[in-house]
Structure formats: C-alpha cells, structure tokens
C-alpha cells in the first residue's frame, strides 16, 4: 500500500459515474454485509492488478461467490464455481477505447517506481510512475485467468484504489498542507480570471522604468508568490522581451526551486504532461505548469512568511507537531516549510498592493496635477504646494498646462473642508521647480508657523489655467516683504498667481536660531472655504503679544520706580524725625519689584497676593518702629509705661494677704499712712518669696476682697486674666537687655522708661517729658510708704511667678521695703553698663559694707534677673545730684557696695521713704508686682530689635500662654 501513497487522483471521484456498472449486482453482493462487499472489492483489486496467487488464496478463504460463465477462462477452484471473467453483455460499462481515453484525460497513474509486482512473471503489467498508461497496458487489466467479480462500482484499477486515493487526498490535506497538483492546476485558472481586469489596466498604463527590475515581478517578498499576478505583470510589461528565459511565464506557476527539483527526481512530473495539458479543460494553449521555476522568480534563499500563508495546523485543532512526507513537497519536511496556496484575503491584499504600486509609479513618472470635477461644489482634488517658494512661475504655469489636459487622476482625493486633514495626502514627487533652501520656510506655511487658526468658510481666488481651475495657496496681490508686512492685504483677483522668490521667516525666527524643517513640517492642502488666510493676522497676533509684554514690562518698571521713591521719602522722613504722612490710596510699596510679567499673564494670583501681603506686613512693621522712635523722642508712652498705667493703680488698690492662716487688715488707698514707717527686714514675705508660690487676688462683684486660705489654681478666672495680660511682656525681657544710651540725660530717660520714682522737682519740671500727662496713663503714686507701724505682717511683697512643684500661698500686698531694697540694689548694673558710670568697660564697683546681705534661699530668680528696679531711694540717691555724687564716689574708688548689692548675697537695710509721691512710673509703685523693667529701656537702639509685631498682635485678653 505504501507504493500508492503518492497517487493523487482526486479528479477520479468526478469521473466515477462513468465507470459505474449498470448491471445488477448479485443478490449476495447486494444483500451482503459491508464486510462481504469489501471482500468483493479486494478480490476485484487482486484480479485487476494480476495478483493471481493472492486472488486464488483470498477466493478460497473468503466467503465470496463468483458466478459461472461459459465465456470465461477455465478456472475451477476446488470449492467454487468459476464465473465468467467478463461482465454480462447487457452491461453498460464503457468500451475499452472510452476507458482508455477517459483514463488518459484524467491523468491516472500509479506511483510504483521501485517496488516490483508480487508476481514477477507478470512484471510487464506493472504501471510505473514515469510511464504512460497506454491502451495496451490498460487492456491487460483483467486478462488473467482468474474470474472477475461482479461489483457495483467497476473501475479499471478497482474501487479500492479509487477509494484510497480519495482518502489520501483528504488525509494529506489534513496533516501536510502541501500544494497538490490539482490545486496548482485549478488555482491559476481562477487567478487568471481575477487578474484579467488588472492586466488590462496595466496595459493602458506603462511602467516608467526603462529597465526590467525584480520588483516588477515580485512586488513584496513578504507575500506568497501568485503565478497569475506574475504572469499578468510579465505579459503586460513592454520593457521585458518576450523570449527572455529568466522571465518566462511558465516558470511562475510553481514555487519549487530548481535545486529541490533536482534533489527529488521521483517527485518530478510525468513526461506526458503536455498531452494531459492539452486535454485539460482549464489549461491555456501556451501554459506549461510542469516547467521548473527559474531562479529569478524564487531565489534560493527565499524564506516564505508563514504568518501570511494561511492558518497553521493549530487552527484546525491539530496539536500533533509531526510531519509527514507526502505529496508535492520539496523535501520530506515540506509539510511545515512548504509554500502554501494564497488565500482569498491574500489575493485581495496582493491586488490592492499592485494597484498601489501602479499609482505610485505613475506619480513618480508624472507630476501630480490639480484636477477638478465640474460638480456643484467644485471640490479641490489635489494640490501640490512644494514649488511655491522658489520663484519659478513660468515653469509652474507650463507644468500646470501640461498636466491639466490629462484629466482626473485615480489618486485625486476630494477635499471638502479645509480644516479636515484626515483624508488628505501629499504627492511623493514635486513639480519641476526649485525647493526653498534649508532653514527657510516657504510662504504658504507662515500662517501655520505663526499659530494662526484659519476658519473654513471663505473661498480662495481660483485661476483657470488650460481649462483647469488652479487653487492659489496665497492671495494674488499679496506680495509681502521682509520689512513691511502691512502690504500683504487680502484681495480677490483673477490674474495669474505671482509668488515671491523668497519665503520670509516668522518674526520669532528673524535671527535664524530655530526653524521648522520644510520636509517634516509640510502642511496639507486645505479647502477653498477659508477666511482670513493671510499673514497680517499672524502679524496682529504677534503685535498683540508684544504689546501686552511691553505693557507688563512698563507696569513693572513704574511699580519699581514708585517703590524706590517711597523708600527715599521714608528715609528722608526718618532722618528729619517727622512722622511720614498717611497714604490715602494704594501703596505702591506693596507691589513687588520682582513681579514677572509672565506670571501676570498666566494669572498666578495666589503667589502675587501672598507676596503683596508679606510686603504689606513689612511696611506695617516699619511704621510701628518709626512710631515707637517718635514716641521716645517726643515723650510718648513706652510699652513699660503703658503697662504701668494699666496695672499700677489697680494693683495698688488691691488687698493682699501676707501669710497663710493670718488675716491682713484692709488697706484703702485714701487712708493716710505714715511715711516714716520702720522697715521690716525680717518679714514673712521672705518666706513667701522663698516658697515661690502665688495666690492671685479674686475680685467679687461687691468690691475688693481677698481669700487668705485659697490655694493657687491655674483655672481661676483672675489668674488666667493676669497671666494673659502679662504674657506678651514677659517674653520680651531678654530682648530689652541692651546697653544704656550715652546721652547726657540718660538718667532722666531711665527714670522715664524703667520706672524710677520722680521727685517733686521732676514732676513739676516742664522740661521733663514725664511731667506731661498722657492720655493713656494717669499719674501713679509710690506706695512704698504705705507700711504703717502696725502693719508689720501686712507689708510683705511676694513675687507673682510661681515655681512649679512647690506648695504654699503667696500673697500680693503692699510693697515691702526689704524686697524693694533688693530690687533697687540692681540699679547699679545700669550704672556699670553706662559709659558715664565708669571709666573703663571692665571697671567694677566695690561692695557697700553698710548694706545688709540680700536673701538668697527662696528668692525668685525672675525678681533678681529680670526685675531691674532702680535702687536709688534705698541708698539715698533720689535725685540727679545724688547720682552725680555716687558716680564721683565710684570713680574715686570709694565704697560703692550700695550700688552693687548683687556682688554679695547680703540683705540691704531698707530706708524709709519720706513721703508718698504720685508717680506714673512702673518700678517704684505698688502696682509693680510683675517686675516689668529693664536697665536698657532708655536705649534708642533697643527699638531696632524690638519685636513690635508680636507685641501688637499677641497682646490682649485672649492670650492663653505665659512666657517664663
């Protein structure tokens, strides 16, 4: 059976009816089982192929019955009657001549090239693959002495061979995908019919190439070779000689290289193929499908694109990767690597590609004209803009005349809308005109280069040239120059378009630093319905942008100038000591000098507003600083004096408790108190000072009262009120420690600022600034002499600041002379820092032996460090003359321990104050319970570092934090 695997008689099935016998089959054959019918066909196969021994053995062992016939050859098997070897006379089988003709027409042959027949005696009846099936050999079928069997399908070679051929065609198509000969015979006929219109089109449009190239035969190497397409291309190409053997059309009908054909001689076609071709109904007279293909059609190194050659075996559900040596494959592994027939989709794709190649070749040989159909819209078909910037007007006119007479081209595209560029296409070739130089943009691209958006509702003037309307890319009378763009005005005209010989650059590209490459920035043609397609609009846009930029620059310069002038005015005002006038309008200083016009154009308002707020805050701080300086120069209130006026009277009127479990007498402000009260050096106030606790006074609705046994509670309303009131000033104590000014009246200034008690001469002296009554602060009085002789236990003064972690009750009472003396002893520090108090910066004062040591144990550190009260009264220094005496004594090396009690921790004996003086100063009043004083309050330079912003913004009853 293996010898017949290469037989491809798929066309036998179509001719099977010609060999069917009309004789009635035997009853045993008609009513027998299919297995018995198969036995009859097997026996028929043995008989027709002269397998006598096999047929006799099979006849003895099988159950078939052969009918007897008198005209049959003598054959009497032992167990069967010999039937007639020929069919009955009434059989409608074809005559041997008809059978021979049909067999030769159907190209039936057996592939039994090497295997001999089992019966070597009848070897002459064997039909080889390369031999012709002649009539003599066909008549030898059935000439053996074996009786023939009566079968329903009686064919010369037997039904078994026919059935196996059909099965093998299906099986090989299922597993191998190899081109078979019937497919190769059928496919060219259909392809030829499909390619006939294409060939006619090619004949009317000759190829411009003067020499034959391989691309004319094989359009795309990635696609499978189509013999009919190649035939049409070669036949319709006038440049190819008819007798060229390398381009012979017979070689285009197979895809097997000659090398493979030589390697597989047994797969070659039979020698009688020309005679079979003559009888085939679908073959042409000049076509030989069995001629080997030349090397130019299929190169030896050609690798087909299997992705485009039909589906793979996996698309049919076949997962078997094995290959089968079958059919017309170039080699045994041709099942996977062979050439597949083109599918209808590939044929359509190849046809479309061929049309594209034709259009492209025509475009390369001829310039693309402007063709217009005479329809209602007069639509623009094709426009080439690549020669408008070179000045070759004469050549363009000649070119338009020559191309306008050719009519509508197949590649012309209709352009309805100027803005719709999705279906537009530029030609691949340019008219015979010079291109603009590199770096120079053609004039028709300037509107796009300038970013101009062109509406699509105004037509462009059209010129009739040679009977064809030509669309002008620019207005006719538009002749711009490099310097004057205003002359490019839109007008309508019917004259021939005159284009400039140069292409002016965009205004932003005057220096040639950057440009748009014409090859990459070529704009597509647009519809005739276009409005304002002129450069002046791009110029107007550029002018508007330039004008806005110049205005923004001018505005920024004006703001900078106004700011500079305002700074100069403020500087002059500060140098003259006058207060600058308040501005009624918007302050130009609030604008930033660094405002970028780009930010203004882009609308970055948040950043500019934030910057303006910062500038406004800075100006406000400067104004506050200038006001503070003016207040110091004119005798206005300082922050300490303001707080003195706020708290001195109220605190002086408060009733303070001294120690726990002891009642203090009620002290009214209008009760006369002796000024010569003895000082209580060892009062219980020292203990309360050591304890570091505080008991704030609560205020009832009926009047002034106190609670001697009430412990300190941070949640007390009055404590919160006092803490909030004192918070902004306690935080500023370290900033106020600056050297004392070296002004001659530094002592007077210190008295004013730090709260030194004034005498009557100073209060009544018009030259002293504090003698003038302020509208914010009434004159306070010194309550240091309120200690009556019987008020020993009620003259204690305690610190306001509580030490955390310690218990006890600290009372607020009338200022004690001992504590006051301790506070006043620190005034010597002012004299040490003052240039007028000592000769050298390193000079120190000697301790005063007459002063008692200060309390050391539990004294609050804030009272010693931050409370810098003047101690002039305790040392009998109550006037400027005494201060001068103290200075002279200090210079002479005398005892100055009274002025520097901080050198030793010894308590100083308090000296009674002679009388009660109403004083608005802070330190020496009964309201000086917080110690808001500094030795540098009179320094003018202190105001430069003073944080007025926090002073003005944080002060108030809502301040919740206390700064220790």
UniProtKB/Swiss-Prot annotation:
InterPro entries with a match to the protein in the record: LisH
Transmembrane segments: none
Polar residues composition-biased segments: 93-103, 261-270, 508-523, 664-700, 707-716, 724-752, 767-801, 818-828, 857-868, 894-905
Annotated ranges, domain LisH: 34-66
Cited PROSITE patterns: LISH (PS50896)
Feature: compositional bias, Low complexity: 16-32, 69-83, 575-589, 869-885
GO CC annotation, single: cell division site
Alphabetized UniProt keyword annotations: Cell adhesion, Cytoplasm, Nucleus, Phosphoprotein, Transcription, Transcription regulation
GO biological process terms, semicolon-separated: cell adhesion; positive regulation of transcription by RNA polymerase II
Subcellular localization, as worded in the UniProt entry: Cytoplasm; Nucleus
Function of the protein: Probable transcriptional regulator involved in cell adhesion.
Protein name (record): Adhesion defective protein 3
Source organism of this protein record: Schizosaccharomyces pombe (strain 972 / ATCC 24843)
Gene name of this polypeptide: adn3
């Amino acid at each position: 059976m293996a010898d017949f695997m290469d037989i491809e008689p798929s066309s036998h099935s179509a001719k099977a009816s010609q060999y069917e016998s009309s004789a009635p089959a035997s009853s045993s054959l008609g009513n027998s089982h299919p297995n018995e019918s198969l036995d009859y066909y097997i026996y028929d196969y043995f008989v027709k192929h002269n397998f006598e021994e096999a047929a006799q053995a099979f006849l003895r062992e099988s159950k078939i019955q052969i009918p007897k016939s008198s005209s049959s050859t003598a054959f009497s098997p032992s167990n069967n009657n010999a039937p007639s070897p020929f069919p009955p006379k009434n059989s409608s089988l074809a005559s041997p001549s008809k059978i021979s003709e049909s067999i030769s027409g159907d190209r039936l042959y057996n592939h039994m090239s090497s295997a001999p027949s089992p019966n070597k005696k009848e070897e002459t009846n064997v039909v080889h693959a390369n031999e012709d099936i002649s009539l003599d050999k066909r008549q030898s079928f059935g000439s053996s002495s074996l009786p023939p069997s009566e079968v329903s399908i009686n064919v010369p070679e037997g039904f078994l061979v026919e059935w196996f051929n059909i099965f093998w065609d299906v099986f090989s198509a299922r597993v191998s995908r190899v081109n078979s000969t019937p497919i190769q015979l059928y496919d060219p006929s259909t392809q030829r019919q499909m390619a006939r219109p294409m060939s006619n089109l090619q004949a009317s449009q000759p190829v411009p190439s003067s020499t034959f190239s391989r691309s004319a035969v094989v359009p795309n190497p990635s696609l499978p070779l189509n013999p009919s397409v190649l035939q049409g291309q070669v036949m319709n190409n006038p440049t190819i000689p008819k007798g060229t053997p390398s381009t012979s059309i017979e070689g285009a009908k197979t895809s097997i290289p000659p090398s493979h054909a030589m390697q597989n001689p047994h797969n070659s076609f039979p020698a009688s193929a020309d005679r079979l071709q003559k009888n085939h109904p679908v073959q042409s007279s000049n076509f030989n499908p069995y001629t080997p293909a030349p090397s130019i059609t299929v190169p030896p190194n050609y690798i087909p694109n299997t992705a485009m050659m039909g589906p793979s075996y996996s698309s049919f559900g076949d997962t078997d990767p094995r290959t089968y040596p079958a059919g017309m494959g170039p080699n045994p592994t041709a099942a996977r690597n062979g050439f597949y027939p083109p599918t209808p989709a590939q044929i359509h794709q190849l046809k479309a590609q061929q049309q594209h190649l034709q259009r492209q070749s025509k475009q390369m040989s001829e310039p693309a004209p402007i063709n217009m159909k005479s329809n209602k819209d007069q639509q623009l078909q094709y426009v080439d803009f690549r020669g408008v910037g070179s000045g070759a007007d004469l050549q363009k006119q000649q070119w338009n005349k020559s191309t306008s007479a050719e009519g509508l081209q197949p590649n012309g595209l209709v352009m309805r809308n100027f803005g719709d560029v999705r279906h537009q296409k530029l030609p691949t070739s340019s008219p015979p005109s010079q291109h603009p130089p590199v770096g120079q943009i053609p004039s028709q691209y300037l509107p796009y280069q300038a970013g101009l958006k062109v509406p699509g509702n105004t037509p462009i003037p059209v010129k009739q040239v040679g009977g064809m309307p030509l669309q002008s890319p620019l207005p006719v009378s538009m002749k711009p120059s490099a310097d004057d763009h205003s002359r490019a005005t839109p007008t309508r005209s019917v004259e021939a378009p005159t284009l400039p010989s140069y292409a002016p650059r965009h205004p932003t590209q005057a220096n040639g630093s950057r440009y748009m490459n014409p090859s990459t920035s070529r704009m597509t043609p647009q519809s005739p319905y276009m409005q304002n397609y002129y450069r002046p609009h791009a110029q107007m846009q550029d002018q508007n942008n330039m004008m806005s930029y110049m205005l923004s620059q001018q505005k920024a310069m004006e703001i900078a100038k106004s700011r500079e002038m305002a700074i100069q005015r403020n500087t002059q005002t500060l140098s003259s000591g006058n207060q600058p006038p308040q501005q009624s309008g918007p302050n130009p200083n609030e604008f930033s000098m660094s405002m970028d016009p780009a930010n203004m154009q882009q609308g970055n308002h948040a950043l500019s507003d934030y910057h303006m707020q910062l500038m406004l805050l800075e100006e406000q701080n400067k104004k506050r600083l200038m006001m503070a300086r003016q207040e110091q120069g004119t005798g206005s209130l300082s922050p300490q004096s303001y707080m003195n006026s706020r708290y001195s009277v109220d605190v002086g009127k408060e009733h303070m408790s001294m120690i726990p479990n002891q009642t203090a007498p009620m002290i009214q402000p209008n009760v006369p108190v002796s000024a010569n009260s003895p000082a209580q050096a060892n009062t219980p106030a020292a203990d309360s000072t050591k304890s570091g606790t505080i008991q704030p006074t609560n205020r009832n609705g009926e009047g002034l009262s106190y609670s001697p046994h009430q412990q300190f509670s941070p949640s007390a309303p009055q404590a919160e009120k006092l803490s909030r009131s004192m918070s902004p000033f306690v935080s500023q104590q370290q900033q106020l420690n600056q050297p004392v000014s070296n002004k001659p009246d530094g002592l007077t200034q210190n008295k004013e600022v730090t709260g030194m008690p004034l005498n009557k001469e100073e209060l009544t002296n018009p030259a002293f600034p504090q003698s003038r009554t302020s509208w914010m602060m009434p004159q306070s009085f010194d309550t240091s002499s309120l200690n009556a002789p019987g008020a020993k236990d009620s003259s204690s003064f305690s610190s306001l600041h509580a030490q955390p972690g310690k218990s006890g009750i600290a009372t607020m009472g009338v200022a004690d002379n001992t504590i006051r003396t301790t506070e006043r002893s620190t005034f010597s520090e002012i004299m040490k820092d003052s240039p007028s108090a000592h000769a050298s910066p390193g000079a120190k004062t000697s301790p005063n032996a007459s002063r008692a040591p200060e309390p050391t144990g539990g004294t609050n550190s804030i009272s010693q460090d931050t409370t810098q009260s003047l101690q002039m009264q305790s040392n009998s220094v109550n006037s400027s003359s005494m201060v001068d005496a103290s200075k002279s004594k200090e210079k002479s090396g005398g005892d100055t321990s009274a002025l520097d009690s901080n050198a030793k921790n010894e308590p100083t004996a308090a000296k009674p104050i002679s009388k009660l003086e109403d004083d608005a100063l802070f330190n020496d009043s009964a309201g000086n319970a917080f110690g808001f004083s500094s030795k540098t309050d009179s320094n003018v330079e202190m105001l430069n570092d003073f944080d007025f912003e926090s002073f003005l913004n944080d002060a108030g009853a809502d301040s919740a934090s206390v700064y220790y």
